[in-house]
Swiss-Prot record:
GO terms for molecular function: ABC-type vitamin B12 transporter activity; threonine-phosphate decarboxylase activity. Keywords: Cell membrane, Cobalamin biosynthesis, Membrane, Transmembrane, Transmembrane helix. InterPro entries: Cobalamin_biosynth_CobD/CbiB. Converts cobyric acid to cobinamide by the addition of aminopropanol on the F carboxylic group. Signal peptide: none annotated. The gene is cobD. GO terms for biological process: cobalamin biosynthetic process. HAMAP family: CobD_CbiB (MF_00024). It is a multi-pass membrane protein. It comes from Methanococcus maripaludis (strain DSM 14266 / JCM 13030 / NBRC 101832 / S2 / LL). It is found in: Cell membrane. The chain crosses the membrane at residues 54-74, 88-108, 155-175, 207-227, 286-306. GO terms for cellular component: plasma membrane. This is Probable cobalamin biosynthesis protein CobD.
């Protein structure tokens, strides 16, 4: 397990400084790698089950191999630096590139701000950037719901899971996870084109998020009093509704937060989680929940491994 100072500084750098420019962002580079091999292996939109399964698997293996090699070499180079201040700072800065704490808050808050200003059309356009559903027909309630769903799901994807894999496996663990997560975002959905080609990526993402998503849900339960939530309701939501989404993982944070803040989150035609009116105040408290759950994780990790 790596020193807690690396995780604390990495989250601090990401939360208060933000991500590097796209030209040098590792996750953007990973996305370009995925697209490159997709163009090599899947030059046509036609579907062939066996071919797509094989080439989708090869795409994942090749990209993960490249990411692991690069992250491992970077980690070795940093660890060879004798000056501890430079070594710790550089390691933490690189690690921060695997986290999306600041961007999660900013993207989730944007549609909420438009709702506050009674600009529903801009809110729908804003929330379209963070969810895959059609937002054209959404009302105020469902725009807020989509924003909160995205924030609660991405507590795992963007922050807790990268920190967990970094804690156990260092830079290679964090960036291998981010690579799998990027794969899932790009090709891991059940469209005709990616039904088989993206299957390996989707399964691997489900596996890697299984434990982190449940840890993230528990963090939301424990930290509930700090963001205006209710511990008992959060706990009931976690166990009663956590498995009610199509994803085997995302429901645990969404259901926990929905019940903790007494609000109904709904993706029309797919699921309803929690009960109660969604308000702007509850939406903003959801973003506080992100910060407090991450803070709690870092405190627990520091107590255990400092």
């Amino acid at each position: 397990m790596i020193n807690p100072i690396y995780l604390i500084l990495a989250d601090f750098f990401d939360r208060y400084i933000g991500e590097p420019p796209e030209k040098v962002h590792p996750v953007v580079f990973i996305g370009k790698l995925i697209s490159f091999f997709e163009n090599v292996f899947k030059s046509t939109n036609s579907v062939n089950k066996n071919r797509d399964l094989l080439f989708g698997f090869l795409n994942v293996v090749l990209v993960l191999a490249i990411v692991f090699f690069m992250a491992f070499e970077i980690e070795q180079a940093i660890n060879s630096i004798s000056n501890s201040y430079i070594r710790i700072s550089l390691y933490s800065i690189i690690l921060s590139f695997s986290i999306g704490h600041k961007s999660l808050i900013e993207f989730s808050k944007s549609p909420i701000k438009f709702i506050v200003n009674n600009d529903l059309e801009s809110a729908k356009k804003s929330v379209q950037c963070i969810v895959s559903r059609n937002t054209n027909e959404l009302d105020k309630k469902h725009v807020l719901s989509a924003s909160i769903e995205s924030a609660s799901e991405n507590i795992t994807d963007s922050i807790i899971a990268p920190l967990i894999y970094a804690a156990i496996f260092g830079l290679p663990g964090a960036f291998l996870y981010r690579a799998v997560n990027t794969f899932d975002a790009m090709i891991g959905y059940k469209s005709e084109k990616y039904l088989y080609y993206g299957k390996t990526a989707a399964y691997l993402d489900d596996i890697l998020n299984f434990i982190p998503s449940r840890i993230a849900g528990m963090l939301l339960i424990i930290s509930a009093p700090f963001y205006g939530g209710n511990v008992k309701s959060a706990l009931l939501g976690y166990f009663n509704e956590g498995s009610k989404t199509p994803s085997p993982n995302s429901g645990y944070t969404m259901a926990t937060l929905a019940n903790s803040l007494s609000m109904e989150l709904e993706k029309i035609g797919y699921y309803k989680l929690g009960k109660g009116e969604i308000t702007v105040e509850k939406a903003l408290n959801s973003l506080k929940a992100v910060d407090y759950s991450v803070l709690l994780f870092l405190i627990i990790y520091m107590i255990l491994f400092m």
